[in-house]
Amino acid sequence: MMKTLVVLAITLAVVSAGKVKFQDCGKGEVESLEVEGCSGDYCVIHKGKKLDLAISVTSNQDSANLKLDIVADINGVQIEVPGVDHDGCHYVKCPIKKGQHFDVKYTYSIPAILPTTKAKIIAKIIGDKGLGGCIVINGEIQD
């Protein structure tokens, strides 16, 4: 679950580790997000580069399965971020328990096919009982 949100954060950063401000679109499950080369409330990521992330999450439900959805919102049009493994259990040992805390480190390669643009990245973790966490990050994708 936590690794899932990490992937979301992946889609926004680059040069030295820092805490990233994000909008919570869930119910406070995500406690912190660190992205290599990024800090504050706006991240710039570069196509073709690797992105290192660390995220802290507390599960809001018991769940045997986790699904990760990550989209880029570009001028109101939501586009699925390519290359994301949607099976959250590949990142976190399932099943998970309500109240369980996760600290996950994740590395993601920013696809070169992404457009150069400003975007909001929306990452959602979905468990057996619905939304397990959600964050929005403001940023920009550059060459």
From Swiss-Prot:
GO terms for cellular component: extracellular region. InterPro entries: Ig_E-set, ML_dom, NPC2-like. It is found in: Secreted. Residues 1-17 form the signal peptide. GO terms for molecular function: sterol binding. Its main location: secreted. Keywords: Allergen, Disulfide bond, Secreted, Signal. Disulfide bonds join 25-134, 38-43, 89-94. GO terms for biological process: sterol transport. Belongs to the NPC2 family. This is Mite group 2 allergen Pso o 2. It comes from Psoroptes ovis. The gene is ALLA.
